């Protein structure tokens, strides 16, 4: 019931912020990490992309929950199934509302954990257990690339805050025809310019998305 209400409220937010021209805003939650140059406070970022994803996550999750009430009615472990499903929804919401890359990574890994638990829900079956372990391991390969991409962004922009990164990204590269300003990132023994560093970081972030969305070559867990 609460998830249906959340889905309806997501549509309200979509029409007000996404289509209504409402301004993006941030809702502070708590102070999280402060260590040297690294500052990552827990906050909810609400902008056009966020409200679109809130509609997708909450609407689809509400429909899945409603369908599962009948589909799982015979299973004696139904409470555990709905706990895993709710954990998956929570992790997805944490991911899409994150205000910084550290918070996003927590949601990202939460989705991976919930996927592992759901895939291996009927753990008595060897095939289900094997599929869950395979999915977990393959996704960790992609997540390693994603984590390296986060480290790279912190080195390039000096922040993990999404607002700061978005604001500086447009002016990060030198103007057309201007000379490069030295080494921006050392990666695997290579001294990368700003343009090359951004390309490598984007590929590392994409590597994480490849694992989560089962794209070649990190697709082998999906058929199982």
Model-derived regions: residue spans:
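...captures the hydrophobic TM-helix bundle architecture rather than a specific catalytic motif
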Residues: 1-224
